[in-house]
From Swiss-Prot:
It comes from Escherichia coli O157:H7. The gene is pyrF. InterPro entries: Aldolase_TIM, OMPdecase, OMPdecase_AS, OMPdecase_bac, OMPdeCOase_dom, RibuloseP-bd_barrel. GO terms for molecular function: orotidine-5'-phosphate decarboxylase activity. Gene3D superfamilies: Aldolase class I. This is Orotidine 5'-phosphate decarboxylase.
Length: 245
């Protein structure tokens, strides 16, 4: 992977891999992070770690050279969501997300909150349908559309509001690239190398399949974090992706 210049002290990688840091122990998380190279991936910090260890933990990861996807899925009244997104930008994260189901006014307010940050603003992504959800789960909420159709409706709203892209399942990526264009970024969890267990993600795909489907950033968790040699696992994934490109 080629290390390129950044507008900040954070390293920039051209790898599409984002490793999910799902730890409840700060030292264990940092011990893992110190085994891998920021040129090989970005890192995702979610609700558990951010609640436990706060912004300072994000700064520690940034000081090690990593770009951070702050995966807090903001979903609130427009003013509150906008202030939260601006706070994430102040923290210097690379990507932040909101729930598309928060609606157009909320997403527009979040986007407008990033205007003062200019080129230093993080990517603003909306969550469509959680990858753990199936049609029966949506039906329980009164949604009669299929997960794919509902995700597409929310993605269309997201693009209309001017956000950078959406979180979606890999199965939706081909259709989304056709409908929303190449510049609309697709971020996909549930990506697992061949031979990995599915875990709690229902709709999964391998990194190579995700790349072919049009996924821009693929979130990979336990197959890397629980690997005996995570650095080598990352290098193998990236090498395979380069061969598939």
């Amino acid at each position: 992977m080629t290390l390129t210049a950044s507008s900040s002290s954070r390293a920039v990688t051209n790898s599409p891999v984002v490793v999910a840091l799902d730890y409840h122990n700060r030292d264990a998380a940092l011990a893992f992070v110190d085994k891998i190279d920021p040129r090989d991936c970005r890192l995702k910090v979610g609700k558990e770690m951010f609640t436990l260890f706060g912004p300072q933990f994000v700064r520690e990861l940034q000081q090690r050279g990593f770009d951070i996807f702050l995966d807090l899925k903001f979903h609130d009244i427009p003013n509150t969501a906008a202030h939260a997104v601006a706070a994430a930008a102040d923290l210097g994260v690379w990507m932040v997300n909101v729930h598309a189901s928060g609606g157009a006014r909320m997403m527009t307010a979040a986007r407008e909150a990033l205007v003062p940050f200019g080129k230093d603003a993080p990517l603003l992504i909306a969550v469509t349908v959680l990858t753990s959800m199936e049609a029966s789960d949506l039906a329980d909420l009164g949604v009669t559309l299929s997960p794919a159709d509902y995700a597409e409706r929310l993605a269309a709203l997201t693009q209309k509001c001017g956000l950078d892209g959406v979180v979606c399942s890999a199965q939706e990526a081909v259709r989304f690239k056709q409908v929303f264009g190449q510049e609309f970024k697709l971020v996909t969890p549930g990506i697992r190398p061949q031979g990995s267990e599915a875990g709690d993600q229902r709709r999964i795909m391998t990194p190579e399949q995700a790349l072919a489907a049009g996924v821009d950033y693929m979130v990979i968790g336990r197959p890397v974090t629980q690997s005996v040699d995570p650095a080598q696992t990352l290098k193998a994934i990236n090498a395979s992706l380069q061969r598939s490109a």
